[in-house]
Amino acid sequence: MTGSAERPAVLVYRHPGTPPAVLRQVCAGAEEEGVPTEVVDAPDGGDATALAHAAAQASRLDVGIGLDASGAAAVHHGKLPERGPAATTGLDGTPADWRRAGRTAARVVKGLPLG
């Protein structure tokens, strides 16, 4: 098997209505830290935390990001309880907040401090 399916990546589960700017900033934040992302359209939708938890469960790196239609983002680790994400942005998130969410996910993967 070849292609991105073999490459470990932080999975980004996005609701079909996710604003493009949110997705762009989140992925840029992770990639700035040297961690690749793989974007998956989540057909069932859901809130950012539920999407992030599902992404973390499916990721070979045990880390996932969820993006909902409102523009909220959540970062999750596969070993955390579903409603206990590692980080979230609110509905009033800014591009800096979304990029920080991507960096946070990458830093969890690398085992670095989040601050």
Name the predicted role of every residue range.
Residues 1-3, 101:
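Short N-terminal or domain-adjacent regulatory/targeting segments
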Residues 5, 58-60, 68:
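A generic structural signal for short, non-catalytic loop/turn and secondary-structure boundary residues
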Residues 5-53:
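Negatively charged, low-complexity tracts enriched in Asp/Glu with abundant Ser/Thr
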Residues 22, 29, 64, 98-102:
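Glycine-centered structural positions embedded in regular secondary structure
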Residues 28-36, 57-60, 103-115:
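Generic secondary-structure signature for well-ordered alpha-helical cores
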Residues 48-64:
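N-terminal small/polar loop signature for handling phosphorylated ligands or for N-terminal nucleophile
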Residues 62-91:
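Mid-chain, well-packed structural core segment of small domains
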Residues 80-115:
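Ser/Thr/Gly-rich flexible loops in soluble cytosolic domains mediating phosphotransfer, phosphorylation
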